[in-house]
């Protein structure tokens, strides 16, 4: 089978290094998670989710209604928060998306967001809807093969930049490499993702902190045992080893079992996580 072509555009800033991050960190859990999604007669999606971590339990219920290019999400959480999000796709022009998020009872945390995807650019702007808002902007320029971008946030209340990051990436049909400068220039991370075959991929990330002069090196791999079952493993230079197996026992319904072991303290009990996602 021929390899798929790289994406037509550079995507958003959050897409830089995403393939390596997903391979190394996505779906690894050390807690218990349960998610159930059903659909009402009017097409509304209703999702109930619960997470148990240590002795604490967190739950939420979310409803999503779509009508043409407009969607409305309402989410209620067990800590008495209600968040309503309005999303409009292709807002006046293809590739332009508008998002309005209104939390309750913390209305001062409301924010408006605009995203624009172009074959040679990906832009994202967020502004808080209060008297002294936090303003965020990220931009990526280039193509699906090579992209460079920046991500900044400015607090109008203090007049300070709370975030300024930069990144670049190179993508081919089978390989993605990225370099990110994060934490106001304090940390530098290089990542690599390689699809070595139709069923297997490997990835690595090297992160350096300038303030602590500490390096973190993480290796990972994933392999599809068959069309429904995937296994993953990772290891870092601090001796932390993790593995998971994920099985799609029915369309869109997944069970994931993961474990984490400190190989430098093997006498300590390992951590085990379980995730169950049910969709009709």
Curated annotation (Swiss-Prot):
This is Mitochondrial outer membrane protein porin 2. Keywords: Ion transport, Membrane, Mitochondrion, Mitochondrion outer membrane, Porin, Transmembrane, Transmembrane beta strand, Transport. The keyword Transmembrane applies. Pfam families: Porin_3. Signal peptide: none annotated. Forms a channel through the mitochondrial outer membrane that allows diffusion of small hydrophilic molecules. The channel adopts an open conformation at low or zero membrane potential and a closed conformation at potentials above 30-40 mV. The open state has a weak anion selectivity whereas the closed state is cation-selective. It comes from the Eukaryota. It comes from Oryza sativa subsp. japonica. One of its GO terms (cellular component) is mitochondrial outer membrane. Induction: Not induced by osmotic stress. Consists mainly of membrane-spanning sided beta-sheets. GO terms for molecular function: porin activity; voltage-gated monoatomic anion channel activity. It is found in: Mitochondrion outer membrane. Belongs to the eukaryotic mitochondrial porin (TC 1.B.8.1) family. Coiled coil: none annotated. Expressed in roots, stems, leaves, palea, lemma and pollen.
């Amino acid at each position: 089978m021929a390899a798929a072509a790289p994406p037509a555009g550079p995507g958003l800033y959050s897409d830089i290094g995403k393939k390596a991050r997903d391979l190394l960190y996505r779906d690894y859990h050390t807690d218990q998670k349960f998610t159930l999604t059903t659909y009402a007669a009017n097409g509304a999606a209703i999702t109930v989710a619960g997470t148990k971590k240590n002795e604490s339990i967190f739950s939420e219920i979310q409803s999503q209604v779509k009508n043409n290019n407009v969607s409305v999400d309402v989410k209620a959480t067990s800590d008495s928060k209600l968040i309503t999000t309005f999303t409009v796709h292709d807002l006046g022009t293809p590739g332009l998306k508008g998002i309005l998020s209104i939390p309750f009872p913390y209305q001062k945390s409301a924010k408006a967001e605009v995203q624009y995807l172009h074959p040679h650019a990906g832009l994202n702007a967020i502004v808080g809807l209060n008297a002294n808002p936090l303003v965020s902007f990220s931009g990526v320029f280039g193509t699906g093969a090579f992209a460079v971008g920046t991500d900044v946030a400015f607090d109008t209340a203090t007049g300070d930049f709370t975030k300024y990051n930069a990144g670049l990436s190179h993508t081919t049909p089978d390989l993605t490499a990225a370099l990110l400068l994060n934490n106001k220039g304090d940390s530098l991370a290089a990542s690599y993702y390689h699809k070595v075959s139709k069923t297997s991929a490997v990835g690595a990330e090297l992160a350096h902190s300038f303030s602590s002069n500490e390096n973190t090196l993480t290796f990972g791999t994933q392999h599809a045992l068959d069309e429904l079952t995937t296994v993953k493993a990772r290891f870092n230079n601090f001796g932390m080893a993790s593995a998971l197996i994920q099985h799609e026992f029915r369309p869109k319904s997944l069970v994931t079992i993961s474990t984490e072991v400190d190989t430098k303290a093997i006498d300590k009990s390992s951590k085990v996580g379980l995730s169950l996602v049910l969709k009709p």
